[in-house]
Amino acid sequence: MAEISDITTQTQTVVLDIENYQSIDDSRSSDLSAPLVSVSFVQKLIGEFVGTFTMIFAGCSAIVVNETYGKPVTLPGIALVWGLVVTVMIYSIGHVSGAHFNPAVSIAFASSKKFPFNQVPGYIAAQLLGSTLAAAVLRLVFHLDDDVCSLKGDVYVGTYPSNSNTTSFVMEFIATFNLMFVISAVATDKRATGSFAGIAIGATIVLDILFSGPISGASMNPARSLGPALIWGCYKDLWLYIVSPVIGALSGAWTYGLLRSTKKSYSEIIRPNCNKVSSRDRQEASQDEICVLRVVDPANQNYFICSSPTDINGKCNVTCKLA
């Protein structure tokens, strides 16, 4: 909707103009009804498949190595592996697909209008396929036998309650709530420092595994539990790892949405002292200003002209923003 319409090097003026102005509701509806059959969407699905496969293979490999070779990895090591692989995949694939790797995250994003509903089934299918294939490769590579559902055979890389179902359900809810709350904070809120989103999310996974891993297995992800369950045919208490993460993710996203919602827009809260102009006014800012930025406030659908001096490197450092 918004595009850079003019960059003048002599006066270092930056103008963000609005072409073919439309309401924020119209723009949201167009963004949330993205076509299903497109090269871009196929690329996203491939990204979700690769990211989920890598995450499950690396994380579950750490579990197998720890159980097979005398526990050299330990619980903190396993937690660190999961956190690191998620962080790496976020920075590798986040710009392609959004790096969900988790059906609960995709559903929560869609419920909070941060992701198109019609793309959720495709994302979930790609995530489940990646998880299932990763579990199959793990079983083949490590020669894990069939008698794992009883927990008396070789290592089972799936998840199962080591305590009561109620306790495990609550732990999965809390862990997934924490994860989705952090994801919503660092990945969807412009007030956050987006470049550190991957680190924050990875660190949250490490912490969640440390406190919930010994109790529920710290799934936080229906695909993470479903893939191994399908390969080994272990379905006992599987519902717990589908229902609880989805409820936890929805609750985390909605709770952060309450923090985001205010009577004033985000721009009005932290960006004061700008000269307001009409949404139909094409008036340019004073050429006496060194840096000029024209933006639109989605809440009020009005234009604002903002300006500030350059920084010590001669670059525009716009500190005067919406009001």
Curated annotation (Swiss-Prot):
It comes from Arabidopsis thaliana. This is Aquaporin NIP3-1. Belongs to the MIP/aquaporin (TC 1.A.8) family. NIP (TC 1.A.8.12) subfamily. It is found in: Membrane. The modification N-acetylmethionine is found at residue 1. InterPro entries: Aquaporin-like, Aquaporin_transptr, MIP, MIP_CS. NCBIfam families: MIP (TIGR00861). The keyword Acetylation applies. A motif (NPA 2) lies at residues 221-223. GO terms for molecular function: channel activity. GO terms for cellular component: membrane. Its main location: membrane. The chain crosses the membrane at residues 45-65, 73-93, 122-142, 167-187, 196-216, 239-259.
